[in-house]
Amino acid sequence: MSQHPRFIATWRDELPGFYTELTPTPLNNSRLLCHNAPLAQALELPETLFDYQGPAGVWGGETLLPGMAPLAQVYSGHQFGVWAGQLGDGRGILLGEQQLSDGCKLDWHLKGAGLTPYSRMGDGRAVLRSTVREFLASEAMHGLGIPTTRALTIVTSDTPVRRETTERGAMLMRIAESHVRFGHFEHFYYRREPERVRELAQYVIEHHFAHLAQEEDRFALWFGEVVTRTAQLMASWQCVGFAHGVMNTDNMSILGLTMDYGPYGFLDDYQPGFICNHTDYQGRYAFDNQPGVGLWNLQRLAQALSPIIPAERLNALLDDYQPALLREWGRQMRAKLGFTVEKEGDNDYLRELLTLMAREGSDYTRTFRMLSETEQHSSASPLRDEFIDRATFDAWFARYRARLEEEGEEDDARQRLMKSVNPALVLRNWLAQRAIEAAERDDASELSRLLEALRNPFADRDDDYTHRPPDWGKHLEVSCSS
């Protein structure tokens, strides 16, 4: 293993005018709080880079590694359905692009790195609370198999940062194949610079959709893949019970990654209209609205791409979104029920169960995990005691067991399949809050313990991580402030 990773700078070299070069602004008395050891190993990084005793170094923006060329990218976007103009990157700096030994290229993005020319009225900082939440969420989603940016390190400090209250400044090193957002394209479309839209699209195709690079119709084919990836991501969110909270177009990844973890939340009680962001007064980004918002955001991206793709082709590709969404959602939800063969009427079993869960406020994650224990030849179910309306549950469960018998699968094999898609553990807000409170005392032990559990969310476990949330943790409100 080399002493230092190798960095290249394709964004800087190939896209002049898309960024401003600058270096991070360090925090006061910054120090490394935690690092993601499995990710560090995948990135071929030596352990000597992670020094918990000395200065924060590269993790706190105090030094740069050889080959790094730090810059802030420029992008715009729609926020809560309204064009907001230029938005960022107001506190994040792309330090460089790491070239791995297998040829893979990954961004190193330092969040909370200080003011940039795109900071608007912001202070360029992130607080410890939000960096811990993003660190945990990105690794939780990765553990669930959902496309996401990753988190490598958290640095804490003695720098005070004002939000609703005064909090501790922090930085997070985010790793991703790309940080290109829908809003990057919108920025140049609204600036009436269609040649820049084409230039950026060509860059994205060459670096991230190389199989399309030689196609004459490459721009349309690429947009079609973005539509499909976005539809599949929305389906995955719905199936695991994840609410993003702030699906503005500048928070949408061109690669179909979950990114920009802010006021997110995983469902506790199954509430289809769950709103995790307490500043989302109209419920625009409520849980059950997310698939529709995904399409709306794609329509905004299509508008930005209209200088390089004919309108009729864009509309035809957008029409593929709903079928792709329903296919992926249906595939994943059938697996959650233990159905490996698609049959007419399968959606009825799901709709009836979800209706009962919504009426009774059943815990989303626990219900499907307990359903995984079903024995098709037994009328008894541990899930029965979770419902007040047991007559309705009994009637549904009898039909469900009959449907399972049609699968012809032994209980053990089916239960293994169901447990591989129905997690025992998700990152509930109260679990994150407990880790945050410890981290604010410079104690990373709960953060490390929770992180280890989130890496294996499908494993059988019986501890406080899988119990119902306590009363104080059931309806925690989360805001956009970070």
Curated annotation (Swiss-Prot):
InterPro entries: adnlytase_SelO (IPR054838), SelO (IPR003846). GO terms for molecular function: AMPylase activity; ATP binding; magnesium ion binding. ATP binds at G88, G90, R91, K111, D123, G124, R174, R181, D260. Keywords: ATP-binding, Magnesium, Manganese, Metal-binding, Nucleotide-binding, Nucleotidyltransferase, Transferase. Its cofactor is Mg(2+); Mn(2+). It comes from Cronobacter sakazakii (strain ATCC BAA-894). It is an enzyme of class 2 (transferase). The active site is at D250 (proton acceptor). Mg(2+) binds at N251, D260. Its EC number is 2.7.7.-, 2.7.7.108. The lineage of its organism: Bacteria, Pseudomonadati, Pseudomonadota, Gammaproteobacteria, Enterobacterales. The gene is ydiU. This is Protein nucleotidyltransferase YdiU. Disulfide bonds: none annotated. Nucleotidyltransferase involved in the post-translational modification of proteins. It can catalyze the addition of adenosine monophosphate (AMP) or uridine monophosphate (UMP) to a protein, resulting in modifications known as AMPylation and UMPylation. It catalyses: L-seryl-[protein] + ATP = 3-O-(5'-adenylyl)-L-seryl-[protein] + diphosphate; L-threonyl-[protein] + ATP = 3-O-(5'-adenylyl)-L-threonyl-[protein] + diphosphate; L-tyrosyl-[protein] + ATP = O-(5'-adenylyl)-L-tyrosyl-[protein] + diphosphate; L-histidyl-[protein] + UTP = N(tele)-(5'-uridylyl)-L-histidyl-[protein] + diphosphate. Belongs to the SELO family.
